[in-house]
């Protein structure tokens, strides 16, 4: 589970930002929303609010870059365009098998080199104080090299900088570096990142092909989201009833249309009053998106995965988004986690759904981009457990709100039309 994400000079973030999923246990409200293990307390869900083009997506890009780096994939990192530095800095603190770890790296985007990386395990003593034990530190700029495997320490300074240390040495020969790699890769492999505006149906299709308990839970999830649906399944073509011409139709939504797998899509059917119809052609956009996200949600809950969702509320009824969040906040969820961006303020509910530290904002002004939590606002600033947070946000008291001047655009359009009419006369 992710505990903290750190970034500097990455995408929209010029200065240091910290996104934390650490629970404040002084607050006893909604205890089921917190995963508790070995005296570490981690939030199961976090919702991120903010106007368009403020930096919400950039925060997700940072998580994706961390995952890709740890999996030895193309990282896609870009330094902030307003700085002279080419060095992107990223870090993550996470839980794995009941243990807490921290990993940081610096990447020179111009030279395509990893100039710094460090990995440590964090322990808590009997007084609840945290202490880090360094496993690896490679700082090629300051020429500081440390490794818990002494035989590795002597070679760090001469290995290539075009990748992480664990990918440029044979880790099987070094006990701790090998364990470090397994921990980092295992953590990264549990992260799924999806965009509800461009969510692939293929993940659900592949899962629907296999008749097992996971598939049954996905079907129940989809049926419960659509009260009029009798069943949802992957069937043989001869079971699909199409009228003349309907087989040539394609889905309206290009984001849900995968031409090379169109036959798979047609075989994914919904059943209404005993009639099988291709879901991609007949179901609403919202139902199709529910079907697409269903496999990710069920897999996350069943397998303890980390689901990162951009625009969770896109084309989905607010009661369904609340239900999805509630599944992760439920006390029966012992290891899954969800991070999502959202615009729907109906989810900003600290009276029935969220702890204050579960609501985050991304705010942008002329000076920069800021990432902060609702928990950063104190009672003295007018934010208490009984406060109507939605109303506070509507009024702009919490920031991270767009300030559109669309009325000025309308007036300029109107005045332009009048001017054109006058010229014509």
Where are these regions (language model features)?
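Electropositive, glycine-dotted interaction segments
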Residues: 106-243
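Pre-Walker A-like glycine/lysine-rich segment at the N-terminus of P-loop NTPase domains
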Residues: 1-65
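Short alpha-helix of the ABC ATPase nucleotide-binding domain corresponding to the H-loop/switch region
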Residues: 317-322
């Amino acid at each position: 589970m992710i505990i903290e994400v750190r970034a500097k000079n990455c995408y929209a973030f010029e200065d240091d930002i910290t996104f934390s999923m650490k629970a404040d246990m002084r607050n006893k409200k909604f205890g089921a929303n917190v995963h508790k293990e070995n005296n570490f307390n981690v939030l199961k869900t976090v919702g991120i609010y903010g106007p368009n083009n403020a930096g919400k997506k950039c925060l997700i890009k940072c998580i994706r870059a961390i995952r890709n780096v740890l999996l030895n994939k193309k990282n896609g990192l870009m330094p902030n365009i307003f700085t002279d530095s080419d060095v992107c800095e990223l870090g993550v603190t996470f839980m794995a098998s009941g243990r807490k770890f921290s990993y940081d790296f610096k990447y020179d985007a111009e030279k395509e080199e990893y100039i710094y990386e460090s990995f440590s395990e964090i322990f808590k003593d009997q007084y609840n104080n945290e202490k880090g034990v360094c496993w690896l530190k490679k700082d090629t700029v300051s020429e500081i090299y440390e490794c818990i495997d002494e035989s590795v320490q002597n070679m760090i300074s001469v290995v290539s900088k075009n990748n992480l240390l664990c990918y440029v040495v044979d880790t099987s020969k070094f006990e701790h570096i090998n364990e470090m790699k397994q921990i980092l890769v295992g953590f990264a492999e549990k992260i799924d990142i999806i965009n509800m505006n461009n969510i692939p149906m293929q993940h659900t299709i592949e899962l629907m092909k296999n008749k097992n308990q996971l598939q049954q839970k996905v079907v129940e999830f989809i049926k419960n989201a659509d009260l009029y649906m009798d069943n949802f399944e992957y069937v043989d073509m001869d079971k699909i009833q199409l009228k003349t011409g309907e087989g040539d139709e394609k889905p309206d939504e290009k984001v849900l249309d995968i031409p090379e797998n169109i036959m798979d899509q047609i075989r994914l059917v919904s059943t209404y009053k005993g009639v099988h119809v291709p879901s991609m052609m007949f179901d609403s956009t919202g139902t199709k998106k529910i079907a697409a996200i269903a496999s990710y949600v069920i897999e996350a809950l069943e397998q303890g995965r980390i689901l990162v969702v951009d625009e969770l509320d896109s084309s989905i009824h607010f009661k369904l988004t609340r239900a999805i969040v509630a599944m992760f906040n439920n006390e029966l969820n012992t290891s899954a986690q969800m991070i999502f961006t959202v615009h729907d303020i109906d989810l900003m509910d600290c009276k029935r759904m969220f702890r204050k530290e579960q609501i985050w904002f991304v705010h942008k002004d002329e000076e920069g981009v800021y990432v902060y939590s609702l928990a950063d606002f104190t009672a003295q600033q007018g934010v208490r457990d009984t406060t109507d947070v939605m109303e506070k946000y509507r009024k702009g008291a919490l920031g991270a709100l767009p300030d559109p001047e669309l009325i000025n655009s309308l007036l300029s359009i109107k005045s332009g039309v009048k001017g054109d009419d006058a010229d014509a006369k």
